[in-house]
């Protein structure tokens, strides 16, 4: 194959039919005349025309629900502006080992919408690595060294005066929580999302001035579901869960970051700052904290501009609900020590409020088939450590385990009966534990990790793992009245002071924070978190779990004696009338193993 010579091309051109030449001229003229109309036909329609039959939800972002097509349109009016995106679970599977719970937080993302031609990309910057330098090129070098992410891409379907509209149905109706991966990792089958049995849950899809809340109903199917799934789902081959999405306006730039100190336990973002001096630590550890400011910055004690308010799940039964409110409210004692008056409040979630709404700090009462962990976490601004939402999940079956513990130790213990008569001490022990647990998990949402040393200096932190302190009377009876300390700890007050104390204008904050740290050392209010201290043979003598006492071996002797008295009193009256004797086994187990954690701790203290 060869190309014709130029002479041949010329000859061909010269021999072209005159009629064909006229046709080419006419076609060219038509193209010029129709060109603008063709361009207009290819331009995007207006947003108003596209959503003419849709129901608007106006807020921080505008959404449009088309009830005829089942589409959810998302209008973005500020391109390249960062916002917060949070995923959570509005309903749960009900299996503790699988770990998909009602009210559970999932991914937190800072995103911005970037337009590239006909596409809109949700960009996630990488805030874990940065440079605080004033040199723009230095900052850009760090930014280009660590990969950002594109969370999603959309086709733009309409636009009006710089505002763009996308069909966000697939984005919201996806498995954002990775339910399928979680179930598979637990060995409970291979599930897939069935889009034909999934839809928007419009009752909890709402728009507000600074946040938009979208909820979806997702159905997952499998031909090989595991026994844990079968044990809790209505149909193990098909499980339906509600997933929640929050699109939130990020806080303004007026929040002041505070640097962490390892001697006071705080959680928060850790950032690698490549502009630090060569003789300084590359890692910058921020304190996670709510935005809390005094009305009067010059006053030693002042009411806050806005208090921190936590809400208890309105589906919690009494007397547990009141116990949760009371225990969480202990933290107000710590904020009072930091100079704030009535800065921390706990209330019941008001009627009509959505627990998944990002504006509510929540304490959820979560049911599962079996007993499991309670936990507390928070939604944080990764740029500053500012806490945007605190979120607690308390497993309801924990209380029943505490009931079994007390039931074995004291004849006549009856958790399900009303408090009164001979059962007062036993019922109060269980509720005391609920108060302590509420304070403990709320502490995690406030940014505080476990402090396993506190049991060695008078139980002065609710952030320890507490064993019930059962005391023996002179009559060799068991006294439950001091089983769980019913107040905030002195260490907790220092931790809140470090995180939140507001110093008068002109004060050197670094010097004042150093004084708080030194006070904790001088008073012996020390901190030690996980750091491999959860097992026999761990490094620290006293940083152990579920123990009591400053001498762990001596306290072990006491726990063995408590166990002996409990076993001596063990009899069939420990179970309810009409129950089979086989139920005694469930009561006996926690009694028989009463000393087990103290034994572990004593062994650890000996090395």
Where are these regions (language model features)?
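Bacterial N-terminal signal peptides that target proteins for export
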Residues: 3, 12-25
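Bacterial N-terminal signal peptides
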Residues: 25-35
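Sec/Tat signal peptide C-region and signal peptidase I cleavage site
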Residues: 37-41
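Auxiliary tRNA-acceptor-end handling modules of aminoacyl-tRNA synthetases
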Residues: 42-316, 348-401, 406-425, 434
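The catalytic-center signature of Zn2+-dependent metalloproteases
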Residues: 63, 348-367, 432-487
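Zn2+-dependent metallopeptidase catalytic core
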Residues: 81, 317-343
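Sec-exported extracytoplasmic/periplasmic mature domains
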Residues: 329-340, 443-444, 448, 468, ...
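Conserved catalytic/binding loops enriched for acidic/polar residues
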Residues: 455-607
């Amino acid at each position: 194959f060869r190309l014709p010579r130029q002479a041949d091309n010329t000859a061909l051109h010269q021999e072209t039919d005159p009629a064909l030449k006229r046709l080419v001229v006419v076609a060219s003229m038509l193209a010029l005349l129709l060109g603008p109309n063709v361009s207009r036909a290819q331009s995007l329609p207006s947003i108003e025309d596209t959503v003419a039959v849709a129901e608007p939800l106006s807020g921080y972002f505008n959404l449009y629900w088309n009830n005829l097509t089942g589409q959810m349109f998302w209008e973005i009016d500020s391109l390249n502006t960062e916002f917060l995106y949070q995923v959570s679970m509005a309903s749960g599977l009900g299996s503790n080992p699988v770990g998909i719970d009602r009210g559970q937080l999932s991914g937190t993302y800072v995103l911005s919408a970037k337009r590239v031609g006909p596409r809109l990309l949700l960009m996630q910057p990488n805030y874990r690595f940065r440079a605080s330098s004033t040199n723009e090129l230095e900052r850009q070098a760090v930014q280009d060294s660590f990969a950002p992410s594109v969370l999603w891409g959309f086709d733009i379907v309409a636009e009006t005066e710089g505002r763009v509209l996308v069909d966000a149905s697939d984005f919201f109706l996806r498995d954002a929580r990775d339910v399928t991966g979680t179930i598979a990792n637990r060995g409970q089958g291979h599930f897939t999302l069935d889009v034909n049995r999934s839809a928007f849950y419009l009752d909890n899809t709402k728009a507000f001035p600074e946040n938009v809340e979208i909820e979806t109903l997702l159905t997952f199917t499998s031909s090989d579901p595991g026994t844990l799934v079968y044990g809790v789902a209505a149909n193990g081959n098909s499980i339906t869960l509600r997933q929640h999405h929050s699109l939130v306006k990020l806080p303004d730039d007026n929040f002041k970051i505070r640097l962490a100190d390892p001697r006071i336990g705080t959680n928060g973002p850790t950032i690698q700052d490549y502009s630090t001096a060569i003789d300084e630590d590359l890692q910058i550890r921020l304190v996670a904290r709510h935005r809390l400011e005094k009305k009067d910055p010059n006053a030693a004690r002042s009411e806050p501009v806005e208090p921190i308010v936590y809400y208890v799940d309105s589906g919690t039964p009494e007397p547990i609900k009141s116990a949760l409110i009371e225990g969480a409210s202990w933290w107000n004692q710590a904020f009072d020590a930091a100079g704030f008056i009535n800065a921390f409040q706990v209330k019941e979630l008001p009627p009509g409020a959505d627990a998944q709404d990002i504006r509510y700090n929540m304490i959820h009462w979560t049911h599962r088939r079996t007993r499991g962990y309670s936990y507390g976490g928070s939604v944080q601004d990764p740029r500053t450590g500012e806490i945007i939402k605190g979120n607690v999940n308390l497993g309801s079956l924990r209380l029943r385990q505490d009931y079994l513990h007390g039931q074995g130790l004291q004849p006549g213990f009856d958790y399900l009966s009303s408090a009164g008569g001979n059962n007062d001490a036993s019922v109060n022990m269980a509720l005391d534990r609920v108060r302590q647990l509420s304070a403990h998990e709320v502490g995690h949402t406030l940014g505080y990790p476990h402090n396993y040393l506190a049991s060695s200096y008078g139980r002065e932190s609710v952030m320890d793992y507490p064993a019930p302190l059962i005391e023996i009377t002179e009559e060799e009876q068991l006294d439950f009245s001091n089983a769980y300390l019913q107040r905030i700890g002195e260490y907790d007050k220092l931790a809140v002071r470090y995180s939140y104390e507001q110093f008068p204008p002109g004060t050197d904050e670094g010097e004042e924070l150093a004084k708080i740290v030194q006070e904790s050392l001088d008073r012996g209010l020390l901190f030690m978190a996980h750091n491999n201290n959860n097992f026999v043979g761990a490094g620290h003598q006293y940083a152990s779990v579920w123990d009591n006492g400053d001498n762990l071996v001596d306290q072990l002797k006491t726990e063995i004696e408590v166990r002996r008295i409990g076993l001596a009193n063990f009899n069939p009256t420990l179970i309810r009338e009409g129950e089979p004797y086989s139920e005694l086994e469930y009561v006996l187990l926690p009694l028989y193993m009463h000393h087990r954690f103290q034994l572990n701790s004593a062994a650890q203290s000996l090395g």
